[in-house]
């Protein structure tokens, strides 16, 4: 079974979301997703200050098997991208919940609370991937 940390929230699209501040979150793809993708060879991320809309594509992860879209877990502004992925995209495979993070997003805390409440907790995500 894939690693599913209890302290994160999860989307149906196999992304994790971690609150990092009152109005910020860090986003990445799950261990389940990186295992399904295989060896990641390229990650396309948005620019800092880009406006993302919940449910819409904001980038791509390319592996030796396929290209998969990344979907925004909430409507927010990009405040940081993981520049290490440009030269080391395999970090998504080796450390999906740590060094392989994708973007940091900022939204007002009320909309952030509402968006996070709609995501899976670890147990809910475990059920989602088991289906």
Swiss-Prot record:
CDD domains: GCS_H. GO terms for cellular component: cytosol; glycine cleavage complex. Residues 24-106 form the Lipoyl-binding domain. Binds 1 lipoyl cofactor covalently. It comes from the Bacteria. PROSITE patterns: BIOTINYL_LIPOYL. Keywords: Lipoyl. The modification N6-lipoyllysine is found at residue 65. Its cofactor is (R)-lipoate. InterPro entries: Biotin_lipoyl, GCV_H, GCV_H/Fam206, GCV_H_sub, Single_hybrid_motif. NCBIfam families: gcvH (TIGR00527), PRK01202.1 (NF002270). The glycine cleavage system catalyzes the degradation of glycine. The H protein shuttles the methylamine group of glycine from the P protein to the T protein. PANTHER family: GLYCINE CLEAVAGE SYSTEM H PROTEIN, GLYCINE CLEAVAGE SYSTEM H PROTEIN-RELATED. Belongs to the GcvH family. This is Glycine cleavage system H protein. It comes from Mycolicibacterium gilvum (strain PYR-GCK). The gene is gcvH.
């Amino acid at each position: 079974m894939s690693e599913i940390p209890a302290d994160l929230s999860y989307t149906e699209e196999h992304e994790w979301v971690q609150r990092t501040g009152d109005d910020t979150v860090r986003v990445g793809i799950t261990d389940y997703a990186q295992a399904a993708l295989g060896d990641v060879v390229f990650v396309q991320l948005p620019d800092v200050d880009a406006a993302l809309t919940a449910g819409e594509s904001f980038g791509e992860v390319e592996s030796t098997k396929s290209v998969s879209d990344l979907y925004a877990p909430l409507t927010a502004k990009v405040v940081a991208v993981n520049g290490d992925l440009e030269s080391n995209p395999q970090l998504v495979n080796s450390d999906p919940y740590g060094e392989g993070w994708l973007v940091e997003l900022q939204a007002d805390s009320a909309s952030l609370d509402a968006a996070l409440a709609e995501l899976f907790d670890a147990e809910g995500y475990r059920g989602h991937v088991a289906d």
